[in-house]
Each structure stands twice: as C-alpha cells, then as structure tokens.
Amino acid sequence: MYIEEYMGIEPKISKRSKIFKNAVIAGDVTISDYVSVWYNATIRGDMAPVVILENTNIQDNCVIHTNTGLPTHIGKNVTVGHAAIIHAATVEDNCLIGMGSIILDGAVIGKNSLVGAGCVVPPNKIVPENTLVVGNPMKIIRKLSEDELKNISLNKDYYLKLMSEYK
C-alpha cells in the first residue's frame, strides 16, 4: 500500500481496516473501521475530502476521487465493485455499486440501492432509496426486493470475512 500526504494532510485510516498491496490513498481521506481497500484501488482526497464509513469494501482497481468543493462520501456497509469510479459523489448506506460503474460529480445514490455493472450515473442525478438503476445513462428500473436487499448485505458480509482471512 502507498499512503501519501497532500498539502500537509495525511490520510486517517482505522487500524481495524485493511489496505491491500498496491492500493494508493492520498490526502484528506478518512477510512473508518472494517473497511477493505483492495489491490490497485486509488483513493485521492486532494481537491476535497473523501470519507468512507465502516464495513465498506472498495474492490480491486476502483478510483475514488473528488472535485473542487465536491467531496466524496461513501456510507456504511457499501460494496464498491471492481473497477468502479466514484467521483465527487455520495453513496449512502447499504448500497452495492456494480463493477465498472461510474458515479459522477454531485450524484447521490440513496440508501439500500443497487447500481448495476457498467452503469453511468450522470452529474447531479439522485437515485432514490431502495432502487435498482442500470444503463448508460442510468435508468431507474424498479424498487429492490427483500431478497435483493439481503444479497447486498450478504455481499458486504462476505467481504468482511474475506478481509479477515488475509494477514
């Protein structure tokens, strides 16, 4: 892992979290308890802060960044799939962001939502709570079922277990 100060600000990373080799975390980044940041992920808090809350997993090759005056906030119990990009946006609690998705500046993903693989959420779009969105640009498909909500939680639980198995 590579942790870098930016303009005198060092990332704040909980000792209960796991940052994997080749991940890069720079600047005004706060990572809470039991967060996993997997191989080759990059998290940059150089233009505004990045906050990632507990039990969240940032999978391989993700990019988390900000824009001037636009922070990035990722809530509790979130799965950010491989190679997803979250740029100056908010992801509320209990969400799954599919592989290769792109969440752009000012967008908000409401809690308990699922952004399908490869989906592009345009700037300033609001995804309502408990919603499935897919496509480029995103389209709201429907409310999530109870089974889908359980699967989001199971995915988060799986990554917590997986993180604990690495030394």
Show the residue positions of the predicted features.
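Glycine-rich hexapeptide-repeat left-handed beta-helix
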Residues: 1-12, 46, 54, 60-61, ...
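A positional/architectural concept
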Residues: 8, 12-66
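Active-site cofactor/substrate anionic-group-binding motifs, chiefly glycine-
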Residues: 50, 71-72
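Short beta->alpha connector loops at strand-helix junctions that form conserved
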Residues: 66-68, 144
